[in-house]
Amino acid sequence: MDLVPGILHADLDAFYASVEQLLNPSLRGRPIAVGGGVVLACSYEAKAFGIHSGMPGRRARELCPDIIFTGGHFSEYQRLGDAAIAVMRDYTPDVERISIDEAFADVAGSRQLFGSPEDIARTVRRRVRTELGLPISVGVARTKHLAKIASQVAKPDGLVVVDPGTELEFLHNLPVELMWGVGPVTKAKFAEAGVMTIGQLAQRSPNSVQRLLGQAVGEKLSQLAWNRDPRAIETRRRARSAGAQSALGRRPATERVFKPVLLHLAERIATRLRAKDRPCRTVTVRVRFSDMRSVTRSLTLPASISATTPLMEVAVDLVRGVLADYREEKTISLLAISTSNLGQDSVLQLELPFGLADDGLRPGTRKGAARGRADRAMDVIRGRFGWESVAYASSALGEKHSVPDEFRSLAEKEL
């Protein structure tokens, strides 16, 4: 392994909120949140009051009566996220984007041209700040896992370089929840087992960690606790799934509420699938109730689809099934659709109607083909005149009541 820490992890700080403050300078230095019924993102000024993503808007207002909510400018998030990644690509072609606001870069081969990895990290930070007006934190290390942790330690708007010889000392003093893949559930399991720091995890035998978390997760985290991470930068990584979600606050669990939301989400996802010729076979929905419990349902289809209406219809059926199983739940706070089992270039082969039902879920039937043609016509119109230029009637009419609040736009951009 190279003794020079050549992996950068760059993460735009409080990205959505920072963009809103950039677009409206009067919001700078003030507690703001993107969203409405649910906080999708918030500024550091809001975080100081204990506000965080996923918190109900009402609770956020209780903690900070002066908080300012904004609806979000998702096209600007995409544009500025793309611009920040473009800055990184000025110094190396080896950039792996993992979300709309963060990416890895391997700059070990760029030293002769642009200086040390630390020099490159400082230059990236300066350019993003001066050219885009956004704060960005960067971690530099020999492995992806450690670079990502270093960027978290660097927040807000900082730089942390982990030199060889100091890696385990740096890593083992940190809380275990900073590890990639340790969420609230895993953190709670670790806490019950008396594991609070990465160093304490490292001292546990791999077998005991596997008994606690399962073989795959336990083995992975045991290795990462010792900074054993052989993963290289994946510059040509293709997404294995595409999804979108909508935070709703507290809405009645009725079809009148959820169907327009699912149609809007299906439009977003299906447009991306068609743009990259990557139809899906598996559709998953997630329903989160007002008590924050989540339920998922999946269906794998006999044929791949990329048309909006079939995707929406599958999602609606899955959500109906969830609500039928949880009749006591009267309100929902979030809906999500995820598509997976993505295919490669879709070639449509028409099916002969040998007395079979003309099933609109099958793209090769007359009904399915007609739906596909309608969607592609809408894609052309939107490509020329913008997203709002054309829409399904039920989506447009229901949008003012059920507009999805959040789309993790990387999937839209880089399927």
What does each of the following model-derived ranges do?
Residues 38, 73, 246, 289-291, ...:
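A broadly conserved detector of short glycine/acidic/proline-rich loop/turn motifs that flank catalytic sites
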Residues 285, 337, 386:
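Hydrophobic, well-ordered secondary-structure elements that form the walls
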Residues 14, 109, 142, 289-291, ...:
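Non-catalytic surface loops within mature trypsin-like serine protease
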Residues 98-102, 141-144, 278-282, 330-334:
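Short Gly/Ser/Thr- and Asp/Glu-enriched loop/turn motifs at secondary-structure junctions
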Residues 1-226, 231-233, 271, 359-415:
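Gly/Gly-Pro- and Ser/Thr-rich, intrinsically disordered tail segments characteristic of DNA damage-repair
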Residues 9, 171, 178, 186-332, ...:
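DNA-contacting surface of Y-family translesion DNA polymerases
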Residues 305-383:
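C-terminal hydrophobic structural anchor segments
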